[in-house]
Amino acid sequence: MTINIKYSSKFSSSKTSSSEELKPKTYIPAYYQPPVSMPKYYVNWLRIKLSLNKLKNIRAIYLFDQCQNFNQYQESSRKFSAGQVSSLTPWYSNFSNYSTVILRMKDTSLPPLENPSNGGTYLFNLITVFPSIALSFNYSWRGDTGPSISIFSFSLSVLFFSLFPQHKNICARAWCRPFRRSLSFSLRFIMSSEPASSSTEKVPEEPHPHSIKHKFQGPQFVIPRALSDYVLNVNNQTPESYEKALNAKYGRDDYITLCLHVTSLCTEYGPLDDGPEYVLLCDSRARVDKLIEDLVKLLEIDTDYVQLELHGGKRLHLQKPDAVLRDIAYKQSNEGSDKFFLEMKLVPSESMKAKIMKQEEEEEKARKHGQYQQYQEYHQQHQAMNDGQSSSSVPSTSSPSCSSEANRKEMETVREPAGPSELMRAINAPVAPAPVVIKIETPVALPEEDETLMDDDEMPSLTVEAPSEEASFEAEQPSPQVPQASIEGPSQQQQIPGTSQQKRQVARGSRTNMISYHDLPPGTGNAPPMACPQVTLKLEKNVPFEAKIRAVAGYTRKPISEVQKMRPSDLESIFHSICIASVQRIKRRNELVQQLQEINAQSCKSPTMTMNKKFTLAKAYQRVQNEIEKIDREQILPQQYMNMPPMPPQGQQRLPPPAYPPGILPPQQNRQQGVPPQFQRSPQFMIGPDGQRYAHPYMQLPNSNQRARILNTSSVQPSEEVRNRLVKIEAMAMNMAQLNPPRPPPPQPPHRALQGELQFLRPGAPDPCNFRPDSKQTYNNTYVTVASPATLTNSIIPWHFPPYEKSGRLNVSNTIKAINEYRLLCNSRQADPASFLEFYFLGDPMPHFNKILSIADYNMYLSRRRCDEADVKIHRMSHSDQLQLYLLELQSDESNVEKWKTFYRIMQWDLPLNNEFPRILLPSSLDIGRPVVDRKKKSIDQVMNHIHRMHSQRPPSMGNSSTSSEASSTSPTNAATATSSPASNRPTTSTAQPPTLNPT
């Protein structure tokens, strides 16, 4: 939310020697509207007070340093020729070494006014005291009620700058939207190094909405440092310092650019439009602490209550107060000019925090002794007295419309009781009509003058809020912290009579997200604190060297062979850093767990907790909980690498895992040794009653007679040796049937391109090439395109496919099949449907030969290679097109023509003739990647004539050698080519559509 904090600059007026008709009757102090992030230096201010009282007079005041050549300009007065405006009277005065300026109208640039009562545009020319420097601005207003508007007024404050002749042709724009008025206002500044003329003045065009100029559009301020010192240091304004400021020279690297963004004003009627972005040129040789001092002096900030903090954006880093902007700012080469972002924040000072803490202690003592009700009444009376004194000391600067009785009654409907006097005095003094928008994390907006003040129970979270998403700078997100008691309000549980929750919700604004008590996480509210166990980490001292190598290889994601070549000292340092990172991660997790316990304890502290504090605690709880879950997901301890199997000796690769469990003989060895079927899955070694490892009794028998005698256990008893080792064979077989369940069916053989290769690389592992995500599909169940991404991402496989050239053909059927398989893969992996083809797009280009890949990357490139071999062509799509294609679910035998048209439109293909789908693209060098018609539906007579013609042209030795199996083994493209007529051998046209068969 936003709080409107008001400031004003007061100037003591002095009498002049001008005539009485030019002297104003009443003087209203000029004011300005600085942005939320103040620029670095402000020098000369153009303070314009435009008061349209009954549409008669327009007044302008220009405060500037005294100049000798002021008399060379001629005073002029112009009159309006339309509407109710009768005269334009320029007047000027002298305010403590400040001169005035002439305001004259450019009658040649006035556009015709069709209906002056409903709207109009007037252009003026404002001449400054600098020679050859001119400022022209135009303004327009729109009235919604027509000629009946008799009295309305508004005020506009503009920041102006001092411009030297070397800076020319600087254009800027400013916008002002009056509060609760059907009135629009705009200003346009044009700076040039030549005297302004009424005939050649042109208004610059607005930049393109997508250009860089439009992004940084707004008033530009050129502020030299020497003149800034002269204006800000009023006590040191001497003729010598003035001459020094005017004669100061600046190099190209003596100034930098700061970009400032004005956030939107938030009122009880909702947020207004966002303000402009300001571009400021300032001295690069200045220090950060000097910048803060100038801003405090310029804004007249009372440091006893509020302190100013500067935060750099994504381009400016304020590390030290004594740092120079030139040293801490770095340039960006990809932009046309150097721009830096700056953010100003107003936070409670240390003395203000001490007062708030002292007041909280008094409340706690009064609550303990049962005198809390009397303390509340005393605090309300004392606060009302302080508010009355502070309001009487501030002069009233409201305009006639704001001080009208109707507006006063309207604002009384949403008035709230005042907050703590100390904080409100710091925020509201000195008061001026124009607000400064400061981002502060509170649920109440404090608008202009007559607006509602903040309630006491809404004061607790006076903390600086992170910048909004619409801001031009990117500030770092603060780490989740528990709300401290030092920044809470003085009376949290105070409920003022006469106020209601509904009124407070109106004052909060439309951007406040309310969270009910049921939305709070478990552990907050009145529930007891939740037990959050902390994790302890114990590192072993004597870690094997092999475990260290595995830990470093897993942490750095490098092969073990490469890690083994490292020096032992480097290996020890990396392993030590891994251990330190694990300790820090566990330490951070324990701190977060302690914060959760503090949040739970604070939520159960008082039963009458306000909704604002509930909302703040819920957000903090969720933020801390998410960070703990993130740490748990990323936590990898060095002890995990110690549980891995031992490494092979130096220079040898790790052996692949066996195809069968330990102790189980393969079927071929069982058949060679003549093992009966009931013992083929028995282990070669068994554990006896004493815990020792014994060989299988069947394997210990030397000849076939003894084996047959053991099998017939009903008549022949086993020998003493077998009895001592293990009991009956039947019991052993029964136990093995219980302990070793039937083995699952072996995986299907891999694709023909990988026959014998994957089994050599990973024998016994499940084959990821045969992807079967959905077994319910009975049609077209030949998955030969997409390889499934395996879950074992740590395994590595070399890419053993040589490079190849992609064909220019397009197979529509295979493309549809590939899209359906990618859709099934997306469903099985629960991926985003709007990105289900990313697995296809990321597979191009192919890796080089023998490149080491993970299982997931290997399957991704393998799927893309299979698609290219099957003539699958899918262009790069947006996420919306991918989602539409995902929801289409087109099949090769689809009968809906609209689906086919939608599919061809998404794939950016030309529709075939007569809506005959699907079609296959024939080889063509003229047009690649577009499906065309290759055949038409033929009648039975045409087919018989075609077969008769083919038999007559074929030699007798060939006969009918083409069978259905050969036709099925050929690719769809070859089949289509074989069945086409000889006419298809003609040269293709530019549309790549071969002529069709003609009936005989």
From Swiss-Prot:
Coiled coil: none annotated. Disruption phenotype: Worms exhibit early larval lethality and anterior to posterior cell fate transformation in a Hox gene-dependent manner. Hermaphrodites show vulva defects, partial hermaphrodite-to-male sexual transformation and are sterile. It comes from the Eukaryota. Keywords: Nucleus, Repressor, RNA-binding, Transcription, Transcription regulation. Residues 633-720 are annotated as: RNA-binding. It is found in: Nucleus. Residues 390-404, 489-502, 960-992 have a biased composition (Low complexity). Residues 355-374, 379-422, 466-509, 948-1000 are annotated as: Disordered. Residues 406-415 have a biased composition (Basic and acidic residues). GO terms for biological process: epigenetic regulation of gene expression. GO terms for cellular component: nuclear body; nuclear speck; nucleoplasm. Binds through its N-terminal region to the N-terminal region of sop-2. Acts synergistically with sop-2 to maintain the transcriptionally repressive state of homeotic genes throughout development. Not required to initiate repression, but to maintain it during later stages of development. Also required to repress expression of other genes. Binds RNA in a sequence-independent manner. This is Sop-2-related protein 1. The lineage of its organism: Eukaryota, Metazoa, Ecdysozoa, Nematoda, Chromadorea.
